[in-house]
A protein has these predicted regions:
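Compositional signal for N-terminal targeting/processing segments
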Residues: 1-116
Length: 116
């Protein structure tokens, strides 16, 4: 896909089984070189944990301010989450998130868990 210079953006419904199926089919059909996944930038290094064969949904990311448990946010993933399917596509297509022909980048929307 990189050779065409095109960018495709998929609008998805979080935790929507139909969105997850459609996204996985589109990624398989288009075979992109780069997959961008919206999420907290603090989780960039954690995405690679999805390569562990024991990591199976349901799973979640938890962001928090140490000592401030009320200042927390979480991002759940189920097998029918489009984000999970995008991560799994990337793993299946390249063998890992940091090597091979496919690059996965988590595009962050910073969680508002900072002190006010």
């Amino acid at each position: 896909m990189a050779s065409t210079g095109s960018t495709t953006v998929y609008g998805i419904r979080h935790h929507g089984p139909g969105s997850a199926r459609s996204l996985r089919a589109a990624l398989t059909r288009q075979r992109p070189d780069v997959v961008l996944i919206e999420g907290p930038p603090e989780a960039d290094d954690l995405v690679a944990l999805a390569a562990d064969p024991d990591m199976r949904p349901p799973v979640a990311l938890l962001g928090y301010v140490p000592g401030e448990p009320r200042q927390a946010a979480f991002w759940p993933f189920a097998v029918f989450s489009p984000e999970w399917q995008a991560i799994r596509y990337a793993l299946d297509a390249s063998g890992c998130l940091t090597q091979g022909s496919l690059t996965v980048i988590v595009v962050g929307v910073r969680a508002e868990i900072m002190r006010a």
